[in-house]
Each structure stands twice: as C-alpha cells, then as structure tokens.
Amino acid sequence: MSIDGENDVVALKRVGAVVAEARDTMASHVAPGVTTAELDAVGREVLRRHGARSAPQLAYRFPGVTCISVNDELAHGIPSQRVLRAGDLVNIDVSAELDGYWADSGASFPVGDVSPRARALLFSTRAALSDAIAEVRAGAPLRNIGRAVERRAKRTGFRVVRNLCGHGVGRHIHEEPQVPNTFDCNNPVLLHEGLVLTIEPFFTTSATRAVESDDGWTLRTPDGSIGAQFEHTMIVTCGAPIIIT
C-alpha cells in the first residue's frame, strides 16, 4: 500500500507494535525443551489481548497463529509438538491484521548454545537486513536492496535463498512490489514516498533455494543446510524509513 495520510501511519504503527510485541514475547520463551506449539500459544495470547488477528490464518487458513521454522526449515513452519533442543536455530515469523491494516516481522534465534557457524549465520543475516534498510529512501532503485543483501552474503560466506523475498504490505499481507534479496540490473522499480514494504533476507550455509515439504506449507532447504531470516515492515520516506515492527 501507499500511505494516504497520517491516519494510515498511526494505524500501521499500531499493528506493527503488536506484531513486534508478539515476536519479542515469543522469543523470550525460546529455550531447550519448549515446543513450537507452546511458542505459538504465546503469540496467540499477545494478538488476542490487542484484538489483532493472525495474518496467515486470515489470508491463507494456515494451521497456526504464527510461523515457526527450525534449522533447515526456512519459512511457514507449522507449530507442533516438536521440542526445541540446544543447538537449534528457530525462526519466529509473526504477521497480523488490526483494524484493516497488516504488518509482518520475523527473526531467528539460537536455542541454548549453538555452533560458531550458526551464530555467524545469525549475525550475518541480521546485518544484511540492516544493510538493506540503509538503501531504503524515496527515489532509490528497489534493486539496491537485493544488492546490499547479496554483498553481505558474499562477504561472510553464506548463501542467499533466491526464491524467497520481501513484499509490499499494509492492506493485505502480501502486496506488490516483490522485494528480491538478489540484484537484478534490469529491475526498473523505484521506491516512492509512502510505500509500505517488508525486507526479509534469508541466508543459509549452502542452499540457494527453498523447496516445499510434504505438509504443503513448510519451506526448507533441499540439502538439509540450516537457514536464518530477519524481517521488518517499514514505510518509505525521503530520508530513513519508518520501521513499524
């Protein structure tokens, strides 16, 4: 969506704050022995308390309130009785609707002590999000976002998942434009003031694409390599973007 006045900004900040609270509250419960269903219940309670609705349930009838993906699962993991174990990486992706406005955010977290390689993956993916956000301003080419993400991956020895990307958001969970995590010199799209979008780099230790699991939802690496994702929703301005999550 594109902002059409201050009321839009206020409403987006409101739903963004709820999404961020759910994400962070769920993260505070990440520990060995916790199930992904238990984490999902934490997120459900935060959304319920604020009168927000789960975006994946509302838009796609997803079988969970939030998406929780572990290790080689990259996105859309279904909350279940799976028990988190020390050394795992868990991704928490929360998106919600409140009063007709939508926001989306995700982050990956270590479960207990993780390997140095896994910790480096988390650091690099989080840094890629920061690098990409620094490219966001009205009039800038959309392709600069993917260039920043790819450069971070190359510098740190990780791989970009090429078939997962960010997206427009605001009046629905997935809107135009797509926001690729790779550089395409032929992409003519320019960012404009008031555009609402997400940026969400996905890095892995070796895979460059995600494949669908037999459950019809979960996207994972085809080679079993671990992945990480970080995501924010933001509003494009003539200066630094407004991060609402």
Protein language model features and the residues they cover:
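Active-site neighborhoods and metal-handling regions in enzymes and metal-associated proteins
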Residues: 1-245
